[in-house]
Every structure is written in structure tokens, then in C-alpha cells.
UniProtKB/Swiss-Prot annotation:
Its cofactor is a divalent metal cation. This is Nucleoside triphosphate pyrophosphatase. It is found in: Cytoplasm. Nucleoside triphosphate pyrophosphatase. May have a dual role in cell division arrest and in preventing the incorporation of modified nucleotides into cellular nucleic acids. The lineage of its organism: Bacteria, Pseudomonadati, Pseudomonadota, Alphaproteobacteria, Rickettsiales. One of its GO terms (cellular component) is cytoplasm. Its EC number is 3.6.1.9. The keyword Ligase does not apply. It comes from Rickettsia felis (strain ATCC VR-1525 / URRWXCal2) (Rickettsia azadi).
């Protein structure tokens, strides 16, 4: 009788609480969390989507080079943009405020680059995907902007916004994956894992 091959362990190349939570939603608990410390500075004239997929790949490949065991490495990078202008991962109150002002009353796009690498017997199999979600904020008053900034929710978030927090009350329209805006598109993640032989539903 043929025995089912056991799944390889999952390594998440990120310490993002949102990405950990999203994996938990699909009943995947990473065996290790190894944040990849890379330079996330955009290249000259680099566009948002290519930036997101490049950074995701660099994170995944760095972790793959650090481990000796066979595993599946999940890496992602989320970039928010207004047109071709990349919004920063806000680190200060002022950066959050500037980002929120830019998206107030208009549509912006959130891109997540997803890179999943299967490392087995020193062989690497790579799956990559770029996922885009369109988000529109209502026109915000100064009072609303100042209140949101005072919450510190947007610190360290792409575009200065945490979609699963208070900012959700500002969204008038969203087209595409909600989990993508949170930092990990689950539909694409499951598809990529399945294509690599990981049993998502029968474990």
C-alpha cells in the first residue's frame, strides 16, 4: 500500500503578525519564522509591481540559502502605490499622515509579490506571483486624518494603512483580494503550495 508522503515543513520568511495570522486562517502553522533582512530600497525608476516581486524573491532566496534542511519557504512583500508613485512603509507620524492624504478620496493599488521556494535535496523549485488589489478611500477630513494618525496603526505598514484596523471604515471600494492587502494573498498561496506538492487540505 502506497503511503502518503509527508508535507515538508513551512518556513515563513517574515515576522509580520498579519502574515502569520493569514496562514493560521488556512490552518498552516510555520515550523519556523525566519525574517529575511534585505535592503528594500527601490531601484531607480523601479515600478511598484516589479519591486514587490523582486523583494519577495530576494527574501525567499536568502532564507533558502540559510537553511540546510528540506522545507518550503514562503516570502512576500507588499507595496502600495498611487499611479507609479510608491508609497513608503511609514515609520513616523508624518509619513503616515502624508500617505493617508495621498490616498484620500482616490483609488490606489496594493501589490503583493509572493515567492514560494521548495528546497529539497538541495534542489530549488520556485513559484512566483504578483497580485494586485484596487482600494478606494472616501474623501477624508483633516479631523479623520489626524485621528487615524494618532492611533499609530499605520506605522510599518505599506502606504501607512492597516486595512484590518480602523482604516477599514474609510474604504468605499475594493476590487481584488482582501488578504492581499493584508500582506499575503491566500488564494494564490494555496495554489502555489499545491503545485509544489504540499497537501493543503489532506494533512
Amino acid at each position: 500500500m502506497k503511503q502518503n508522503k509527508k508535507n515538508l515543513p513551512i518556513i515563513l520568511a517574515s515576522s509580520s503578525p498579519a502574515r502569520i495570522e493569514l496562514l493560521n486562517r488556512i490552518k498552516i502553522i510555520p515550523s519556523q519564522i525566519i525574517p529575511a533582512d534585505i535592503d528594500e530600497t527601490p531601484n531607480l525608476r523601479e515600478l511598484p509591481a516589479p519591486l514587490a516581486i523582486r523583494l519577495a524573491y530576494e527574501k525567499a532566496i536568502k532564507v533558502a540559502s540559510q537553511i540546510e534542511e528540506s522545507a518550503i519557504i514562503i516570502a512576500a512583500d507588499t507595496v502600495a502605490a498611487v499611479g507609479r508613485r510608491i508609497l513608503p512603509k511609514a515609520t513616523t507620524y508624518e509619513e503616515v499622515k502624508n500617505c493617508i492624504k495621498m490616498v484620500s478620496g482616490r483609488r490606489h493599488r496594493v501589490y503583493t509579490g509572493l515567492c514560494i521556494i521548495k528546497k529539497e535535496n538541495d534542489q530549488l523549485t520556485v513559484r512566483q506571483k504578483i497580485v494586485q488589489t484596487i482600494v478606494k478611500f472616501k474623501k477624508l477630513s483633516d479631523e479623520e486624518i489626524n485621528f487615524y494618525c494618532s492611533l499609530d496603526e499605520g506605522i510599518d505598514k505599506a502606504g501607512g494603512c492597516k486595512i484590518s484596523g480602523y482604516a477599514e471604515a474609510f474604504i468605499s471600494f475594493i476590487s481584488g483580494s482582501y488578504s492581499n492587502v493584508m500582506g499575503l494573498p491566500l488564494f494564490e498561496t494555496v495554489n502555489a503550495l499545491t503545485s509544489l506538492g504540499f497537501k493543503v487540505y489532506n494533512r
